[in-house]
């Protein structure tokens, strides 16, 4: 099998990832589990040539100099793939993350109705958080798509690499990739403030400078979507504040309390019928009560504020997990693995 055939096999079998690793057969991750493809082990030269052949000259140079490289790759009429090429103790390795060619809608993802309202905020910062592979990019792409279908504005994305490709519908869409189109997230965000955007998507808020610029963009009247790898709203607020030096923390809390509109923390669970995965969400909305807790550094009280805020669309992860179990979509065991209060989910 060549790389196109392997990727087509993965897409056909609903794989989220294809793993190539010298010394082992190709493997795919399906519904969270890594499975071997019934093929012989691959040699270093096989993996190396498969990956090397789909890189451009710039990517090859990075790969040769740093021994690893991130890039995106598209097979027309099949899908786009986010690729990480690396080296390991048996030789070359690579992981291809499948990015569906179609941007799914919020309805197709079965997102709560509040996600549409969040997408329609005129300004502020909206964060989608969770571990790697929890569907953050998919959720944010659906939210950007909702804006694109309902607004006449300018949506600007900064990604590393570009994942979902958006067509301009009602909105003007400009997508920039770190590397080919800009040297860094912070450079692109600095420029974004002069590019007349209504919505700015920041693929990853990795460092102090990027977080500072995202907060500034939100404060100056833009709607900013961003991602972090935190597992809850409270941890998200702490993570942002902790990035800044002690002398700035109080000011950042004040900025965050004014500009944070929502935090969606999500995780993916196997469905009870074994046919796929479903997202569970903690949803925090920046109500006056939440803003006060952020400003006064009472983040520990945030969980109970979310718990009692269902009338405005808030929910804890455990509340959502209980609902998924009640609706027979997820097993109690599967929900318990992700729950904060495991006693609420009997074996």
Model-derived regions, located:
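Short, flexible helix-loop junctions that flank or precede catalytic/ligand sites
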Residues: 1-347
């Amino acid at each position: 099998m060549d790389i196109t055939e392997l990727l087509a096999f993965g897409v056909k079998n609903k794989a989220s990832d294809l793993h190539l690793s010298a010394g082992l057969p190709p493997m795919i991750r399906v519904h969270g589990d890594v499975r071997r493809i019934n093929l012989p082990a691959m040699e270093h030269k096989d993996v190396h040539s498969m990956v090397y052949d789909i890189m451009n000259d710039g990517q090859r140079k990075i790969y040769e100099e740093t021994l690893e490289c991130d890039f995106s790759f598209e097979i027309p009429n099949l899908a786009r793939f986010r690729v990480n090429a690396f080296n390991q103790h048996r030789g070359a390795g690579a992981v291809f993350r499948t990015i569906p060619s179609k941007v799914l809608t919020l309805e197709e993802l079965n997102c709560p109705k509040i996600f549409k309202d969040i997408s329609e905020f005129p300004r502020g910062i909206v964060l989608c958080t969770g571990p790697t592979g929890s569907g953050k990019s998919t959720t944010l792409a659906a939210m950007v798509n909702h804006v694109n279908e309902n607004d006449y504005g300018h949506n600007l994305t900064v990604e590393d690499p570009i994942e979902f490709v958006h067509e301009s519908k009602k909105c003007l869409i400009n997508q920039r990739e770190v590397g080919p189109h800009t040297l860094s997230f912070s450079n692109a965000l600095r420029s974004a403030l002069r590019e007349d955007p209504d919505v700015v998507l920041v693929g990853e808020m990795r460092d102090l400078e990027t977080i500072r610029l995202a907060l500034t963009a939100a404060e100056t009247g833009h709607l900013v979507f961003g991602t972090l790898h935190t597992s809850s709203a409270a941890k998200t607020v702490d993570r942002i504040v902790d990035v800044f030096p002690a002398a700035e923390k109080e000011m950042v809390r004040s900025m965050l309390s004014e500009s944070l509109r929502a935090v969606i923390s999500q995780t993916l669970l196997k469905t009870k019928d074994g046919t796929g995965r479903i997202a569970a969400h903690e949803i925090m909305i920046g109500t006056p009560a939440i803003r006060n807790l952020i400003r006064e550094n009472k983040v520990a009280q945030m969980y109970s504020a979310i718990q009692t805020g269902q009338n405005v669309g808030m929910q804890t992860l455990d509340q959502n997990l209980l609902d998924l179990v009640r609706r027979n979509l997820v097993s109690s065991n599967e929900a318990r693995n992700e729950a904060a209060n495991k006693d609420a989910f009997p074996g």
